[in-house]
């Protein structure tokens, strides 16, 4: 009888230890954390780069799309200060003659990146959803580079590079045709199966 009384608490204690150890590192803490900062579209920045106040949301949606594709392996988190961000998004002028660019940096002993996006899209004309499409897909492409993804030659991939030619208008147009409202951007995936595989490979090396 005395043995059974002592044994039962020991089993409960063991169960508690197992439970606590399983909670010690949830998927969130096991994920690769990328803090990020997006340059505010101030009045001065808008004059210089033609950014819009909603562009920061497009950048956030792009990073959240990668996070969702990772299935919990990647976690993104906005921070208020540029210096505290592992990934930093800037708006640039048309003088750069590109849609965007990603440059590697070192952040707290980890791989980080500075991303530059051209938000001035005069070629979109009056179609604001096309303009939003171009800015969003550029953010998605360049933050993909920031996370470690390389260019591809497959037109279906968001990481496709125009160095291989292809129909640039259709690259953006195929996504634009899926949209009825701005909010559809966050609900519509532009990440291909190959992009997802490349993301998981990049994150496996951390």
Question: What kind of feature is each model-predicted range?
Answer:
Residues 27-206:
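Zinc-dependent metalloendopeptidases
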Residues 3, 22-23, 27:
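Compositionally biased regions
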Residues 1-10:
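N-terminal secretory signal peptides that target proteins for export/translocation
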Residues 13-24:
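Bacterial N-terminal signal peptides
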